[in-house]
Every structure is written in C-alpha cells, then in structure tokens.
Amino acid sequence: MSGMGENTSDPSRAETRKRKECPDQLGPSPKRSTEKRNREQENKYIEELAELIFANFNDIDNFNFKPDKCAILKETVKQIRQIKEQEKAAAANIDEVQKSDVSSTGQGVIDKDALGPMMLEALDGFFFVVNLEGSVVFVSENVTQYLRYNQEELMNKSVYSILHVGDHTEFVKNLLPKSMVNGGSWSGEPPRRSSHTFNCRMLVKPLPDSEEEGHDSQEAHQKYEAMQCFAVSQPKSIKEEGEDLQSCLICVARRVPMKERPTLPSSESFTTRQDLQGKITSLDTSTMRAAMKPGWEDLVRRCIQKFHTQHEGESLSYAKRHHHEVLRQGLAFSQIYRFSLSDGTLVAAQTKSKLIRSQTTNEPQLVISLHMLHREQNVCVMNPDLTGQAMGKPLNPISSSSPAHQALCSGNPGQDMTLGSNINFPMNGPKEQMGMPMGRFGGSGGMNHVSGMQATTPQGSNYALKMNSPSQSSPGMNPGQASSVLSPRQRMSPGVAGSPRIPPSQFSPAGSLHSPVGVCSSTGNSHSYTNSSLNALQALSEGHGVSLGSSLASPDLKMGNLQNSPVNMNPPPLSKMGSLDSKDCFGLYGEPSEGTTGQAEASCHPEEQKGPNDSSMPQAASGDRAEGHSRLHDSKGQTKLLQLLTTKSDQMEPSPLPSSLSDTNKDSTGSLPGPGSTHGTSLKEKHKILHRLLQDSSSPVDLAKLTAEATGKELSQESSSTAPGSEVTVKQEPASPKKKENALLRYLLDKDDTKDIGLPEITPKLERLDSKTDPASNTKLIAMKTVKEEVSFEPSDQPGSELDNLEEILDDLQNSQLPQLFPDTRPGAPTGSVDKQAIINDLMQLTADSSPVPPAGAQKAALRMSQSTFNNPRPGQLGRLLPNQNLPLDITLQSPTGAGPFPPIRNSSPYSVIPQPGMMGNQGMLGSQGNLGNNSTGMIGSSTSRPSMPSGEWAPQSPAVRVTCAATTGAMNRPVQGGMIRNPTASIPMRANSQPGQRQMLQSQVMNIGPSELEMNMGGPQYNQQQAPPNQTAPWPESILPIDQASFASQNRQPFGSSPDDLLCPHPAAESPSDEGALLDQLYLALRNFDGLEEIDRALGIPELVSQSQAVDAEQFSSQESSIMLEQKPPVFPQQYASQAQMAQGGYNPMQDPNFHTMGQRPNYTTLRMQPRPGLRPTGIVQNQPNQLRLQLQHRLQAQQNRQPLMNQISSVSNVNLTLRPGVPTQAPINAQMLAQRQREILNQHLRQRQMQQQVQQRTLMMRGQGLNVTPSMVAPAGLPAAMSNPRIPQANAQQFPFPPNYGISQQPDPGFTGATTPQSPLMSPRMAHTQSPMMQQSQANPAYQPTSDMNGWAQGSMGGNSMFSQQSPPHFGQQANTSMYSNNMNISVSMATNTGGLSSMNQMTGQMSMTSVTSVPTSGLPSMGPEQVNDPALRGGNLFPNQLPGMDMIKQEGDASRKYC
C-alpha cells in the first residue's frame, strides 16, 4: 500500500490509503467523511470527463487502457483549448481541426456538442468506415434500412461496389486526402483530421439480388439512393494503433432530405454523331445516365424518333432540315420540337449541331449534335397516368363535346372523359348503351365514334401529335380521333384506357389523349386544347356545350377531320347540321350535318361540298386543315363564326343556344381569339357549308352565294337566313318541352362533344328549327333544317349531312324503299326529289314531330345539298380516307357521313345512318353509333341515345330519326342496346305519334334493317355482293362507297322495299323492348330474305360492319349463312364494319341470334351487345364491351390500316376483333398502338392470310372432305372446352385480346369446320355447336367461299376471336390448339380463313397456323395429322391448348404461320 508518494490521482490507490488509515481512527471524522465524499465525487467527475474526452474518434486507441486522473485532466485541457481554437477557426472560416494528436474529433466541422447528436443521428443514417483501399472495414447494422444490404454483406467489401460510378471520383477525393495525405490533409497539416460533407449515390440492393457485387454491371437497371455523407478522415500520423483503422474515412451516411436535395436540372441532354449523310454513327447518353432520371432511355429513344421522323404534311423531318442547315452554316439550332414520353410527360427538345471539319484538310468530317431536352411536367399531359386525367380534363371540354356524355359515360367528365367517355363508350357503351348508351353512346356517339376510330387511330403517335399539333397530328395520325374530337383520347385510351394513357405509344390511350387534345385544340397545341377544354367545360357548365366540342373538335376536326377521313370530314358537317355549335363542338356531328359539305367544312367546305367525293375530299380535308388552322387563328373568321353561331344560336335558341353556341364556341376554343378562332373558323366553315347546303339544295348559285357568304357575308347572311330557321327551330323546341327534353337528351347523346351540355339547347334548337322549318320554308327552311339537323343531328343532321347520300339513296329507295319507309311522307312522290324531300320532311318531322316537312323543296334542297356534298365527299372521303388509314374514320365517316347514305336508307337518312353508325359503332359502334345516329339524324347515336335516355321524349322530337336511330342503333347495338332498341320502340310509338304508323313501320323497318342489315350485311347477299367484292378489293373504301351511295341506296332500297314488311313485323318486336331478340330475329329474317337488304346494308355500311363483326356475327348469321358465307369472304373485310355493326349488332344479334339461327353463337356480339340480354352470353357481354371498345379502337386502327382490300377482310376480322376486344376488359387496356400494330400485322398477314385463307379454306374444305375430323382427343384437349367456354373469355383476356366467349365459340365453329370437332370436343362442340353449324353451314353453303366460310366460322369465332386475333387466336389456338389440332389443317386453314375473313381472323389464322405449328400440328401436317397427330400428347392434351394459350405468343407467330401458308 503506498505512502504519500503514491499518485493521489489514482482513485484506487487513494481509496486504499484511506482504508488503511481508517482503522487508526475508530470514529468517523467529519473531515475525513467530507474528504472521502469529495474524492468520490472527484473520481466520479473525472471518470465522466474521461468518457467524454475519449469518446472522440481520435482517442479510439486510448480505450484500451484506463487513463489516470492526470492524463484525463490534461486531455481535457487540451480539448478545451482545441475547442476554443476551433471556434476561432470557425470565425475565421478556417476549416482546421485541433492540432493535438488526441484532438477530440474532427470537430472542425462538427462541434463536440453536435457530435453526440450527430452520432445519434445515425438513426437517420448508417455509419461506416472505409480504409485507404476503399474496403468497408465497418458498417453499422442499420445499413439494411437504407440500402437493403446486411452488415455482413458489406463488411470487407469494396465501397465502390455500392457507389454510383459517377461518385467514385468524389469519394476517392474525400478518401485519399485523409488517408494518403502524409501530412497533407485538407489544411495541409499532416496531423490534422478533416471532416466534411459530400453527397453520393449508393446502390440499393435489388430485391431479387442478394449480392451487391453483381450490381455494377447492372447499374443501368439498378436503383441508387442519394446519401449525404459526413466524413472524417484520419491521417496516419494520428494512428498509433489499429493499423486497420489508419488512413480511414469514417462516414455517417443519411438520406438527403427532400428539401436539401439539389433540384435536378429540368433539362437533359445527350449527344449524337452523324455522318455527312445525316446517319447517326454514335450516341452518347452518359450525362443522362449519370443524371439517373427515370425513363431517360425512353426519352432518348423518343427524341431521336421524333427528330428523325418525317411528319405528316412536312417534306422533311426535323433531322433532315436541321442537317441541311448544319452543312450549310456549320452551326445550327433546330426548331423546338415536342413529343411525349410513354408516361405522358411532354418533352420539349431542341438540337444544336456543329459541323466538324478536318484540321488538316478542312473538309467536313462529321456532325456532332447536342440534343437538349426539357421535360414539361406541367404541360397538358402530366403522366401517362395523369394523361388520362390531365389530358382528360382538357379533353373534358373536348370530351365536353359531350359533357353530358361524359357525365353519362364517364361520370368524371374531366379525367378520363376521353378515355373514360370514349373508352367507356366502347367499353361501357355496349352495355350502358342500353340505358345510358344513348347518352353516353349516342351523346357520346361522336366521341364513341371517335373512340372506335381512335381506338384504331391511336396507332398514330398520338403522344407525339399531342406535343406537336394534336389537332393536326391527332386528326392526321388518328383520323378517327379527329372525327372523335370528343374522344380523341378515347381508348385510348383504352385506354386509352388502357391504359388510357398507354404510355408508350402513339396508340396508347395516352397517345390518344394527346392526340385528342391536339384534335380538340384545333390550334394543334395541347395548351390551346387545354384552354379550349377549360373554356368548353365552362361553356358546358354554362350550358354552352354545343360549340365546345365543336370548337375544339371542329377546327381540328375540320382541318384534321377533313384531312383524316370522310368520317372526320363528315363529323364536322354533322356538327353543322346538328347545330352550328354542335357541329363545331362536335366535329363529328357537325361534320355530318355538313356531311354534304362536311368535307369542305374546315375551309374547303364549299369545294368539298361541291365536289366532296373522292380525292377532292381528302385533299380538301388537308386543305381544310391547313386553312382550318389559319382560320382557327383567324380571329376575323372567328368573329364571324361567333356572330353566325351567336345569331344562329340566338335565333335558334335565344336563351341558351346563343350563348351556348357562341360561348361554347368561345369556351370550346378556349377563347374566340385563340382556339375559339379556330373553332369559330370551323363553325364558320360549317355554317357556311350548312347555309350553302341549304341554299345549294336550292341551286348551285345559292351554293356559290353561300360559299361567298361563308367566306365573308355568310356570317351575317347565314346568321340571318339561319337565324330565322334557327330561331324557329329553337322556338319549336320550347313548344314541345318533352321534345326539348328528349331533344336535349337526344342531343346530348347524339352530340356528345358539343351537345353534352349544350345538348338541351341544341336539341331545343332542333325542335324549334323543325317548328320553324315550316314557317321558314325555302332557304330559311332549308337552313333551318340544316341547322336543325346540325342541332338535332339526328333527323336534321341526317338530311343535312346525309342529304346527298340521302338524296341518292332516296332516289334509289324512293321506288322501293322510300315509299315503304316513308310511305306517309311521300308515298306517292314518284320523283326521287319528292321522295327525298318527303323523306327529309319525314326526318324533319320526326325530329320536329310537330312540324312535318313543311318545305319539301327546302328539305329536298337540304337533302340534296347534304346528300350531294355528302355523297361526293363520302365516296371521295371514303375512298381517299380509307386508303389513308381512315377506314375507321371511314366507318365513322360513314356513320356521320355515312349518315347521309345510311340515313337515306334508314331514315331515308336517319335509318341509313344507323347501320353506318353500326359500322362505325363497331368501330365505335356503341359510342360511335350514338355519334352516327347523331350525325345521321342521330339515327343510331341520337335515336339510340334518345331511346336509351328519353326514347319517348326524343321520339316526339325526331321520332323517325330517333326510332330509326333506336331501330338502327338497336340493330347495331342490339345486345348492348336492348334497352336502346326498346327505346327505339318507344321512339317508334312516339314516332307514330308524331308521324303516322308508317313512320313507325319505317322505324321498325329501319330498325330491323339496321340490325338485320347489320347482320345481313354481315351475312346477307347484299352485304356479300357489294360489300364482299368491294371489301375484298378495297376493304373499306369500296365497301363504304357502296354502302355510302349507290350500293346503299339501291341495296337499301331493295331491302327496304322488301324488308319494310318484314321489318314491320320485326318492328313490333322492336317496339317491345323485351322483344328485341324477336325483333332482331325478324329483322334478320327479313333482311336475310332480301337481296335488297344487301344493298341496304352496303349503303348503310353494314357490310363493312359485318365484315368487322362477321367473324363474330358469322354464327349469328347462320340463317344468313349463304349471305354470310358470301359476305364472309367479302365481309371478312366488311367485317370491320360488321364487327362494328356487330358491336351494335352483337347486342342486336343476340336478340336475333337466338331466333335467327346460330346467331346464338353470335353471343360474341351478343356478348358485346348482350348486356341487354344477359341470356345470350353474359360472359361475352361483359367482355364484349371491352371488345367493342377494342373493336372500335382496333376497327379504327384496322380501318386505317386496312383500307386496302386486305383491309376489308381485315376489317371484318379487325372489327370483330375490335368488337370482341372491346368486349374483353383485357382488351381495353391494350394499347391502341398494340392494336394498331397488331392490325398492321394482321393486315400484312391478312393479305397473306387472305390468300392463305383461300388456300387454307380450300385445304380446310379438302380436309373436311378428307374428313379431317379432330378426334375427341383433338378437340378434347379439355383445356379447349374449358378454355374455349370459360377461358374463352378469360382466354381472350389472357390473350390480351380477350375475345368474348363468343370468340371461343366462334373459334369453336371453326373447329366446326371439321365436323368431328364439334361432337368430339366438349369445348369444340359447344363452341362448334353455336358457331359450327352456322359456320359449317355457311362454309358448306358456299363451298367456293368455303375458306371464307370457314373463315366465317372462324370469322364468327375467329372473328370473335379475330377481334382479338392475337388474343383470340391464342385462346382459340391455345384452347383450340385442339381445335387447330382437331381441324389441324382446318383449324389453321379455318383459322387462317377466318382470320382472312377478318383482320383479326387473319391474325388468328396466322396465330392458329402458328398455333397449330406450335401445337405441333403443322399446317401441312394437320390434315395428315388428323386424329392421330391430334392424339399427340402435346396436341391432344389440354396441354396443347394450355401451351398454345401460353402460346398466345404463337399468335404472334401467326404471321409466320400465315406466311407459311402464303
């Protein structure tokens, strides 16, 4: 024990000494007690001090021993001094640390007081130590919370394996100075430590991967977390022990708080090198890669695509133009170009290029381009997700084209209106069509119409369009879209909707949306569109919905629609006819009214009007678009338009309409000056055209005058002349409140776009117009009629927009059909003119119920004018547009424009429209139909819509039209519109009220004809004769043309002539909503029995609709087998229409199907339209809606893509596909692009498959002949039955082109080709059961066409499947692998044939072929394969189908398979 010499600082020793002394002192001494207490406290504090002092990183080595009091105090003094020095240094902005070896911690940056909290803040981050070599010598356990790595995974690993490549340098810079600086620390003093903060990106362990080392190579696909590291470097000189810790970097890493995160530059850039020819030789995206912004690869890809793609209307792409400038100037900046990313984000890009010359020869060597990109997050399109919403909101106005429509359809007009509304129309339309369909469908008809078209059109790079000039791009790219200004984004938005915004593609809903925005914002700029949308919305909210869509849609539509296709052109006329505002608002509707002049509507309306048919129309369309744009920006024209619209509106409907029209126009344009001006121009053009039509109907001189007026005077003249009529019309509307309400509903339904909100106003306008039509007979009357048509869209529109077609058709039908259709109107009028007038009057009367056509001459003139312009544009439009991917538009056109041809037949104008709408409807049958109906006197859309909503109410307004619409719509949309048909029935009675029973008959006839025609068209001879050949030759142009004019007129006439009676019979069925099935059956029988029906169908565009829906309808048309067989060949293409028609007809057929024949099999459509009749194929029904949507989308795409003969066949399948696809919910999500691409593939395959079909069908026939019966095992692949029946739908869904069970059934019928298949395979047999016999019958009925028949069989199934050719084919093939197996060759052949029958069918065929091949049933081997090969486990087992189902991809292989066949 030591003496006094002992270190008293040593607590243990002091205590020992005390204890020794204690015995000497027996009693506790207060002094000693105090001393002891003090020493204890001293020791306690010294210990605490030691803990504090040695808690620093620098003293980490000192933890090995316990320092004595003296050392502790000494260290404390040092640290206090250091702290003071640090404070001084901080004041002097010196970032030096204490100079003492045992300096506290790198507190140069972090105070001692802050160190503890910072260390605790490790809760916010993790702690790690890195040595000089970059190895992680220690890492805290909570690293898992940040990087997902476990502590063990990172220990002794290289820190660079988790650091972003771009941060390695920064990290090394922080590591080396501390570790390598032998004295050269940040301050340059060897013994000092430096602490600093830097940011770096650390790899987050991929969920699947457990090792971080493999991530470097995956960097592009890895996720990095931005971390803020507080690092303290420890120089070697400080290290006394623990070599491992020498020269190490001690870091605390925490996530960078959002507020502290550096705002990433909104601009990004990448560089490319091009040779002197402009070809890209290298691409450097390192800067974008380092920025780690999401989607940069897509950004680069789309930027290059946009920059190097030659755009419509431009001779050179941006890249070529820019390259020329660079070569010429050495340095050049490109213009700013825009495009959309897959997520809908708008990007503005500019390219700066420099010509690099050789330093020696000074010769140009290459061009280096810097592409600067700026993401415009807040522009029209937010994200693909927001695109539907953001865009949808702007579109809302556009969609506002049918706010009511949106309300009906979409519920939330703003967001997905285009998508929701459009997609809803197609998707929901089919089922909702029954109740709301009209509103949504009819009202949104244009939208829907557009939807269907757009569904197909979205193929175009809508997103790009949106960026550029949505109005132009959208219309040009998406003709259908242009037409459906209201639902530009529609599917899109299947999407658009699909994915409404379906990110990537132009086809994506997003694309659609973009496009729609563009369309709506005729200015061709999303912002304009947005403004227009807002204005339109405002106007709509104010009740000025009329011009809204119009202005938005119209300018674009005008320019774009005209350009897009007859449909596009027609829609503006319809709008015009429907109402100045409506037409403007709803380019689609407005155009049909101007149908005659619709083509010229934009700016070439007069010209179009005069020579609207043919090339003039497309040219006019483009011209209109150009002019339209200039006019759009022509405030003067806009003012005139406003005046005209206002005057017209005021006169037509002083209170709401005037403001509605003008306001709507303004709103819809966003502002008269801006989009408004475009809209105004469009309206002005439409008004001019309307007046021209009105006056033109009187005489060419009047037309010229009108044209002149339209150019300058028309504003006032038209205003004045139309004003009276308009006023009258408006007055009449008020006169009949019920009518007004009906009109409102009808108008809303009919005029989705513009009439959504302004519908009531417009409808009143229509009514009043009708009412005043009598007073203001003559030019005013005509004008009023036109206006009324514009306003009402149904009767008036049809007469106006379809006046030409109507006139022609009336001429054709007057002898046979018109008298029957309109016996009371002009039963005794032998002259076509009289008949036409009578029909027009009828239509007008139907619309105005109370005012029978007072001025026959005026009406006649109007009809004539419209028809003439309509007819002319129609053929030209159809022909021109069809070639231009306007098949869908064509269909749409036919719907609207077709309203002319169709209405003449159907309603003498209204009815005609219905089939076409049906066609369109199948394209966008349900939605389109309403549109068509609206366009064409709202036959389908309007009548349908009205019947759906206020069938009775509307009936008075335009009973005939409504009824016709209803009937037609019913026919078209039977399944979906069971209610609609019933409404039509109601409409018919109403019609009967307003007009004699004959009208009812007419409606009934029309209805019957509509459905029958649609179906008959699909299957009827008329369909086959005209549709088939034209379709085959010129898929839609010819089909449409025949449908449009002569074909339609003559055929319709016959069908009407014969079918009126038959139709009259069905009419009662139609009258009884519950008897829709019977009515359909009757209609079908009636239509089926008349060759004239074929013509009617054609005139109505039913053949095309049938083509579209033929595959699906084939079964339905078992009764029509012969015609179907014939049709299926042609209808294969016509079936695009067919499928559209079938969309409507699907519902229609379901009613008919059960009674008609194997139409029961038609459940495909039934499924589509079966909603009203769950009985047929509820499953299919649900899917049908998506199918309809898809059908519309696909139909458009296919129509555009299948404008050629291929297109006709493809159309059939395509439309069927569309129909089926819309029916399949899964379909809806499919990108428009995918559809478009598929359709393209199908088109390509279709040509091959068409040939293949014939070959395959022949083979199939041969195989059948050979008895290529699939053994039960073949058919048996139980998977088949299951897959076919249930999977049918699921399969369809699974297939992405989920075809309704009908598809499976349809496909089953294909198997039906092989007689054995049906009985052998439960799936096959049930499926075959429906489809097979009809199909087989049809196929057998037409041995020559047998391949097509088979195709038809397939077309029915395959068509059903066709809709989802790829999908269907797989389900078909997957499940039907058996089918393929059982009918191996047959299936392939049938499949092929069917596919040939329809676009999808083609694909299916191809798919089946490939499927068959996949199923190891080579096409060639299929026959030989027979039951035996079918017995192959692969083939026989459900596996075959399962495999094939998965093999849906095989469908993709279809092309190859079909190629093989080819």
Swiss-Prot record:
Annotated InterPro entries: bHLH_dom, bHLH_NCOA1-3, HLH_DNA-bd_sf, NCO_DUF1518, NCOA2/3_DUF4927, NCOA2_bHLH, Nuc_rcpt_coact, Nuc_rcpt_coact_Ncoa-typ
RNA-binding found in the keyword field: no
One Pfam family of this chain: PAS_11
Region feature (CASP8AP2-binding): 691-743
UniProt motif (LXXLL motif 2) ranges: 690-694
Modified residues (Phosphoserine): S29, S487, S493, S499, S554, S565, S682, S699, S736, S771
Keywords carried by this UniProt record: Acetylation, Activator, Biological rhythms, Isopeptide bond, Methylation, Nucleus, Phosphoprotein, Repeat, Transcription, Transcription regulation, Ubl conjugation
Location of Asymmetric dimethylarginine modifications: R338, R864, R874, R1173, R1177, R1190, R1196, R1203, R1221, R1240, R1264
Subunit-level organization: Present in a complex containing NCOA3, IKKA, IKKB, IKBKG and CREBBP. Present in a complex containing CARM1 and EP300/P300. Interacts (via C-terminus) with CREBBP. Interacts (via LXXLL 1, 2 and 3 motifs) with RORA (via AF-2 motif). Interacts (via LXXLL 1, 2 and 3 motifs) with RORC (via AF-2 motif). Interacts with APEX1. Interacts with BMAL1. Interacts with CARM1. Interacts with CASP8AP2. Interacts with CLOCK. Interacts with DDX5. Interacts with ESR1. Interacts with HIF1A. Interacts with NCOA1. Interacts with NR4A1/Nur77. Interacts with NR4A3; potentiates the activity of the NR4A3.
Phenotype of null mutants: Animals show a glycogenopathy resembling to Von Gierke's disease with impaired growth, fasting hypoglycemia, and an increase in concentrations of triglycerides, cholesterol, free fatty acids, ketone bodies, uric acid and lactic acid in the plasma during fating. They also have increased liver glycogen stores and hepatic steatosis.
Omega-N-methylarginine PTM positions: R1259
Chief location bin: nucleus
Short motif (LXXLL motif 3): ranges: 745-749
Location(s), subcellular: Nucleus
Summary of the tissues where the protein is detected: Ubiquitous.
Free-text domain note: Contains four Leu-Xaa-Xaa-Leu-Leu (LXXLL) motifs. The LXXLL motifs are essential for the association with nuclear receptors and are, at least in part, functionally redundant. The LLXXLXXXL motif is involved in transcriptional coactivation and CREBBP/CBP binding.
Statement: the UniProt record of this protein carries the keyword Repeat: yes
Protein name (database record): Nuclear receptor coactivator 2
BP GO terms, sorted: cellular response to Thyroglobulin triiodothyronine; circadian regulation of gene expression; circadian rhythm; locomotor rhythm; mRNA transcription by RNA polymerase II; negative regulation of DNA-templated transcription; negative regulation of smoothened signaling pathway; negative regulation of transcription by RNA polymerase II
Motif (LXXLL motif 4): 878-882
Chain positions with N-acetylserine modification: S2
The family this protein is said to belong to: Belongs to the SRC/p160 nuclear receptor coactivator family.
